[in-house]
Amino acid sequence: MKRKHLYDYVDLEGLHLKEIPDNIAMYACHGAYDIQNNKIRSLKNAPSFVKGNFICDDNLLGMGSGLKYGPEEVQGNYNCSGNKLVSLDGIATLIGPRLTMDDNRLTSLNGLPSSILNNNKSLSFNNNSISNLSGYGFESVEFYEFFFANNNVTSLRGGPNIVKSNYDCASNPITSFEGGPTSVGRNFYAMALKNLQSLKGLPSIIGGTLFLSMDDMLRIFPDYTKNDRDILISTIKDMCSVGRGISIE
């Protein structure tokens, strides 16, 4: 079938599809393209170009051909969370402001498109099995948001130095914040860090709220108890500038 341009929003969400039908194959979608919440294993028949957001969350990508055959350019956000992806092979070369790939089986970010390594972009890969942030060029990029909660990251080295909005490193086996960002424009999420031994390396500037876990703080400050929350907050405030306060739960 000859592929065509479609100047509209494609909505195939939640239709129990196992594949993208041949009869809607198109070269370009000049709106958003949404195939989330199906049972799709291959992006065959997806458009090569998407002007809006490309949304393929909550499918079975990774059990088939992964992201291969998908769009080469997405001018909006690229969302591929909730799949079975073990690699980024086939991901679009050009991606707009945000790439979200939470809840997959990624062990590395090899293949990450260089287009996401530009200032003011957002990257989210929560709930994967990434072990380090080095080698991807993150440190030279001023991200808008940077999220990697619940991975296997042991060090913040190699990550971005400046994040203009929110930064989330919660639930990783880091021992300190050394090598992490020096400035976070909004919130810094650092809860459930069971291996944390020191607050060394905390960003010097946090524009929003610093979120920490009480269990982690009592391990670092063994002379305090849960009743000393205010003292703990005061102690931590001496280490960094926090715009909206410190939350310890």
Describe the residue ranges of each PLM region.
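N-terminal capping/linker segments that flank leucine-rich repeat
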Residues: 1-23, 216-249
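Concave beta-strand-loop units of leucine-rich repeat
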Residues: 12-16, 29-40, 49-62, 74-85, ...
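Canonical leucine-rich repeat
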Residues: 20, 43-46, 63-70, 88, ...
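Intrinsically disordered, low-complexity coil segments
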Residues: 64-68, 119-120, 142, 224-230
